[in-house]
From Swiss-Prot:
It holds the Pfam family Fe-ADH. The keyword Membrane does not apply. CDD domains: LPO. This is Lactaldehyde reductase. Keywords: Carbohydrate metabolism, Fucose metabolism, Iron, Metal-binding, NAD, Nucleotide-binding, Oxidoreductase. Its cofactor is Fe cation.
């Protein structure tokens, strides 16, 4: 069986990596950027770390800062209009997953106008042309949207999130610069960090996993498990490790898919605007326990790289240890323990479960889930 890997054309790593942006732009002959971001990142000076360099280099830019968490179809349309009126010929995404996902949708629709209805891009998007060129600068250590071929948009009318998978949307250049991430508050570091861990664990056990992605995912789990506590506590070296770990996870899962944790998390964002990382973090250990018997020896590997001494453990003991290691990490970094703590209503669980069953990510889960299974999992996590 042939396995495909799609990655950035170029990626820069390390503190100060954003300094390479101006040379990348000049080398490619781009004329004017539309920066896609949010108002918070403008107000706190993060965007200026990029625009100051562009100004000094004489590079033209405009900005769309209307992105909101769990970006909606309305946001995409608004940003698309700004791009079309800006005279820009490339895009710069500055932010976490929401600005990057919005940027991908803008870039794809701009070059594939027959998909102006954003809903038509759901699933495996049948576009014909590559996106408008995107340079991606993540400001969180979590989503890895800068290296994935996926983006997620919220349909506010139908109260659902949908995933678009399109090789045409991957950014040409990514700048993985921990200097752009240092300003995250501890709670955001925790949520985005466990989001990255979820990507690595789900990618490791997903149905499409193979040798190369397994190597990426188990290394990502090791990096994230070793660095997240320190990063949340303010250790800058740990923060730089998280920047790398989340990217390595993205290299893997983008090419093989995810599973039921993401399938169940997406409806929470659509129904309640729950931060995606928080939803994943709460659900992850519960879904891991549900999947345990369908993962071979992989939970033993997970437990080992998370610091558990697995020598002499039975397979069942090692699987339980992996789940407990995730629960412990969640507790240590301050993740809310229950869905009810983040506003999920028990009476909504049947509708949430149906949406999760229909989510594109659920199909990659190693254990085939029924509607009843998902209802029970939501109740367990509630």
């Amino acid at each position: 069986m042939a396995n495909r890997m799609i990655l950035n054309e170029t990626a820069w790593f390390g503190r100060g990596a954003v300094g390479a942006l101006t040379d990348e732009v000049k080398r490619r002959g781009y004329q004017k950027a539309l920066i896609v971001t949010d108002k918070t990142l403008v107000q706190c000076g993060v965007v200026a770390k990029v625009t100051d360099k562009m100004d000094a280099a004489g590079l033209a830019w405009a900005i769309y800062d209307g992105v909101v968490p769990n970006p909606t179809i309305t946001v995409v349309k608004e940003g698309l209009g700004v791009f079309q009126n800006s005279g820009a010929d490339y895009l710069i995404a500055i932010g976490g997953g929401s600005p990057q996902d919005t940027c991908k949708a803008i870039g794809i629709i701009s070059n594939n106008p027959e998909f102006a209805d954003v809903r038509s891009l759901e699933g495996l998007s049948p576009t014909n042309k590559p996106s408008v060129p995107i340079l991606a600068i993540p400001t969180t250590a979590g989503t890895a949207a800068e290296v994935t071929i996926n983006y997620v948009i919220t349909d506010e009318e139908k109260r659902r999130k949908f995933v678009c998978v399109d090789p045409h949307d991957i950014p040409q250049v990514a700048f993985i610069d921990a200097d752009m991430m240092d300003g995250m508050p501890p709670a955001l570091k925790a949520a985005t960090g466990v989001d990255a861990l979820t990507h690595a664990i789900e990618g490791y056990i997903t149905r499409g996993a193979w040798a190369l992605t397994d190597a990426l995912h188990i290394k990502a789990i090791e990096i994230i498990a070793g660095a997240l506590r320190g990063s949340v506590a303010g250790d800058k070296d740990a923060g730089e490790e998280m920047a790398l770990g989340q990217y390595v996870a993205g290299m893997g899962f983008s090419n093989v898919g995810l599973g039921l944790v993401h399938g169940m998390a997406h409806p929470l964002g659509a129904f309640y605007n729950t931060p995606h990382g928080v939803a994943n973090a709460i659900l992850l250990p519960h879904v891991m326990r549900y999947n345990a018997d369908f993962t071979g020896e992989k939970y033993r590997d997970i437990a080992r790289v998370m610091g558990v001494k697995v020598e002499g453990m039975s397979l069942e003991e090692a699987r339980n240890a992996a789940v407990e290691a995730v629960f412990a990490l969640n507790r240590d970094v301050g993740i809310p323990p229950h869905l009810r703590d983040v506003g999920v209503r028990k009476e909504d669980i049947p509708a949430l479960a149906q949406a999760a069953l229909d989510d594109v990510c659920t199909g990659g889960n190693p254990r085939e889930a029924t509607l009843e299974d998902i209802v029970e999992l939501y109740h367990t996590a509630w």
